[in-house]
Amino acid sequence: MNSMDRHIQQTNDRLQCIKQHLQNPANFHNAATELLDWCGDPRAFQRPFEQSLMGCLTVVSRVAAQQGFDLDLGYRLLAVCAANRDKFTPKSAALLSSWCEELGRLLLLRHQKSRQNDPPGKLPMQPPLSSMSSMKPTLSHSDGSFPYDSVPWQQNTNQPPGSLSVVTTVWGVTNTSQSQVLGNPMANANNPMNPGGNPMASGMSTSNPGINSPQFAGQQQQFSTKAGPAQPYIQPNMYGRPGYPGSGGFGASYPGGPSAPAGMGIPPHTRPPADFTQPAAAAAAAAVAAAAATATATATATVAALQETQNKDINQYGPVCSSFQMGPTQAYNSQFMNQPGPRGPASMGGSLNPAGMAAGMTPSGMSGPPMGMNQPRPPGISPFGTHGQRMPQQTYPGPRPQSLPIQSIKRPYPGEPNYGNQQYGPNSQFPTQPGQYPTPNPPRPLTSPNYPGQRMPSQPSTGQYPPPTVNMGQYYKPEQFNGQNNTFSSGSSYSSYSQGSVNRPPRPVPVANYPHSPVPGNPTPPMTPGSSIPPYLSPSQDVKPPFPPDIKPNMSALPPPPANHNDELRLTFPVRDGVVLEPFRLEHNLAVSNHVFHLRPTVHQTLMWRSDLELQFKCYHHEDRQMNTNWPASVQVSVNATPLTIERGDNKTSHKPLHLKHVCQPGRNTIQITVTACCCSHLFVLQLVHRPSVRSVLQGLLKKRLLPAEHCITKIKRNFSSVAASSGNTTLNGEDGVEQTAIKVSLKCPITFRRIQLPARGHDCKHVQCFDLESYLQLNCERGTWRCPVCNKTALLEGLEVDQYMWGILNAIQHSEFEEVTIDPTCSWRPVPIKSDLHIKDDPDGIPSKRFKTMSPSQMIMPNVMEMIAALGPGPSPYPLPPPPGGTSSNDYSSQGNNYQGHGNFDFPHGNPGGTSMNDFMHGPPQLSHPPDMPNNMAALEKPLSHPMQETMPHAGSSDQPHPSIQQGLHVPHPSSQAGPPLHHSGAPPPSQPPRQPPQAAPGNHPHSDLTFNPSSALEGQAGAQGASDMPEPSLDLLPELTNPDELLSYLDPPDLPSNSNDDLLSLFENN
């Protein structure tokens, strides 16, 4: 037996010993503390130790809540391990999630009971600070019987030579001075377990000669023998609480549910699903409660420091950090997040431990709440390492864990080839270890309720996940409801992004499927149609990239992501009276604060069903009248114990607001904000926003803002006359005209320089030149300036017009290479030969001249919008799910009985610029599911789901200047066109202002028209008392009773412009 094997065996023996001590109330604290310290080093989670470690954790999960044991310590221990669940087999990871959730729930209940009696500042269950001695992880125990009682647990410098602690055992004894101990296998710098000779163990106690002692050899027990391979750990519902949108984050956490290799089976002590009813949020809350008060400041500070280090080390230890970055698990983070307790989730101490730090803040380092907060862990994302794995995990040389698919990750990061499909994709690296998860106990497959078709990896692709009906666009996360076929394209790499959330309407957790990360290095095998659910299911739509803001994914490798990986680009408009928590400041020097708001079940359901509605939480500088999102670097946010990742981007203008609906639950919701530095200069606000997708807006504009060819011709003629009068022979385009008698118009979009697909311009623009409408909407999704790329005049969404005449020209020559056409005063046009073909121009038989003679308007066949809309598919709903290019039309929803009809594909006359066909845009059911990840300003019309796009326009735009024309179209939904419940978009919260009624409103076809936000009932309390629970808590209430479109007309405000908060677009129009 070589030294490494011996080391592994000794460590496993020690873990067996700890397992026994954990069953005894008298020794539980010491044993759990030692284990917690040991788990502070990511190497603790290497596969050779997994069975033994899981054996210990099984005991902890079973006894921690019993009398005489330490629930708080047990929870921390599980949380630290859960934070590293990506390093465990899927079965183990799922167990960890469920145990964590269960203990978190119990902790929360206990906290609630004691809350009335305990002063807020006191931590109900704070492990003794001595446990912080985690700085000295090695707790010695005597080798022999390891009687806990006889040997002091606190690091005993005089420990007997034979003493051996797990910490030393596993890590080998490298003490800070790096002195090595003879015979210590781990001390060897080249030791595989000790990467780079990194003295991870520094801080570990001095070496113990006993480390090699064979005496433990016999003690090792294989758990596997105890648990038959057939016993998957998880019980089906274990983690996803169906009722939970976020399901505590565990819900979707389990990707494919393939469970770990059978051999790992640890006895399934997991509690039946029923036990885990409380969402992770509760756990987090508990943790918060438990730890928040005392150590917050300390912890947060520590965490901040850790984070810094972590970010620095990240490259070095990528994976390690990543794990927490990823937001280790929700559970863990959140809890830790919450729990600033000294030990911080991952035993802060441990994290401080040099080794830990070196490790890039091992997850334990995470412990600091803030840390967790950072976690991008996408909101509903699975607790599992959210992609923490993303990092290549070079961290440990040891066997590379097969990381769980991180479902949480919403989008694969190119850089992580390792994880890419390794997960379970049908082709994943661990493809299907056949026996890996035998389906032996089907009943307990890890499938989380969400996963429709859960299939064990072993069945390669067949149906691993239900066949996606529609390919979701890569970015679109089709959250379909109910998992019914998640629409994911089967093969496209995009699908990886698609998050087909399999949402059940009520239950928001969309399981996003990330099939396999389409990482360049890791080619994603196309998923077979059957596996539409990619391995990474991410329960929440909004998941932010899991890594800390500073870590940038290798963008070049990603497909061009929409701003938010979540799916399609969306425009964002405040909804009238939609403020749930009025702008509030944090108390000075208050490290952790809780802000509560309520969602009525009906409101929650509506939010979940409508992809165009979102609860937006953002922070902005108090002097910024535009309320542009700006997050101070020290702010961390978690909702219902689910840490959210804040996307700060490269500069302060690229910060993005958080979208919370997928981590919310019916009833009481708690936003926990952790800061490490004063943020008094900033205000926080929670508001309902309407986030129509760019595609739905396109459809709406197409229906409502199409300028008939005859009007276009009139406008062109008028331009000719005005130009002739004012500028001689300069064309409106600013280019020299052939003469004053002809205008040369480019067929290329001035934004993308590609052929225009849907020509548009601002109502006030005087030029004939158009830009591509979709490209313009995408350009203005985030903090859009809404200025015409041709003349730079303001061209607000509601003032855009689609030029049918130009569209007809584009259609006429769609299959040719021409880049320009000349238009004469009679509006006859002809293509301009490409310069390379000029020689042909002189040739009477030249193709261009021959094939394209001047064409007069009367000869043109104008594109028929209705046909196009019809071609889009059945009842174009404003919420089409954009399928991946190629996606099929999704009628999924229709089958669901939702009001939404499937949207047909929206095919623009010539495919979309990006090559995507409109149908991509249109695609998809009305999707609530669109993950609303758009930047705030995306003004998409998509808003009403149920309504056909036409209505979408109503929201259109935000702007500072009114465009009368809009009235005609956008804002006032034509009857029948209004697509969704119009939310009154109005600027910030002017609850007082009654919504105006739109001139014409469509009679109600709004399936969800009830979305009107009723402040009075909704905001039952003032905005977020920081933690003041005695104050009425605000709640969001969407009035279902309103069905009259007139009443539901949506009002838009320029995105995020408080200045217009009291003016709805109609009023702007009136002023015009």
From Swiss-Prot:
InterPro entries: Zmiz1_N, Znf_MIZ, Znf_RING/FYVE/PHD. Residues 437-446, 517-528, 875-886, 988-1001 have a biased composition (Pro residues). Keywords: Activator, Cytoplasm, Isopeptide bond, Metal-binding, Nucleus, Transcription, Transcription regulation, Ubl conjugation, Zinc, Zinc-finger. Gene3D superfamilies: Zinc/RING finger domain, C3HC4 (zinc finger) (3.30.40.10). One of its GO terms (biological process) is cellular senescence. Residues 128-141, 489-501, 1045-1072 have a biased composition (Low complexity). The keyword ATP-binding does not apply. Residues 112-141, 362-538, 875-1072 are annotated as: Disordered. GO terms for cellular component: cytoplasm; cytosol; nucleoplasm. It comes from Mus musculus. GO terms for molecular function: SMAD binding; transcription coactivator activity; zinc ion binding. This is Zinc finger MIZ domain-containing protein 1. The keyword Lipid biosynthesis does not apply.
